[in-house]
Amino acid sequence: MNFVLFGATKGMGRALARLLAERGERLFLVEHCIDELEASARDLETRGAQLPVRTAHCDLLAPATFAPALEQAERELGQIDAVIVTAGLFATQDKLESDPELTARILTADFTNTVLFCEEARKRLLARGGGTLCVFSSVAGDRGRKPVILYGAAKAGLSRYLEGLDHKFRRQGLKTICVKPGFVKTGMTAGLKPPPFAGTAE
């Protein structure tokens, strides 16, 4: 299968990309840091991904990069079978409460721009007759929690959007999967006290 992965250079995205590489899948990576993209591509090639693993610049904070990145993926892969989105930002509630600019950045990245990227992916998958859109949200959006009020609000909106997308387009061949991990020990959560049930990216 042909996979486009947004956010595969670190954390859960990297762990998932490595699993797909070990299965011998064909991968196309999109991310904002070119150096990390190229390093990840070479890593995945050594793990069994179909050669070559191509990449394209795509910045979650720059929606104008979404369509060109997916267009390049279509050209390189021939067709896209699945799009996986693990990209996102995080900040603690205390930091967000004291920094309106950071709050706007988190809400924009984790809700508005993630939805805009998914809309670009949705249109392309439906145009080819369907496919899979898998997006990582969070259990932080399931109910209001004091430590993650603002981050959780963004993830709540994202989860509802993905749920509606699946209801509307499943019969047209588009399968939308909303993954909601709990606390996972990654670079994003570094410095936070993990609960007893915390998992790892792997």
Q: What is the predicted function of each stretch?
A:
Residues S138:
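Residue(s) in the substrate-gating loop at a strand-loop-helix junction
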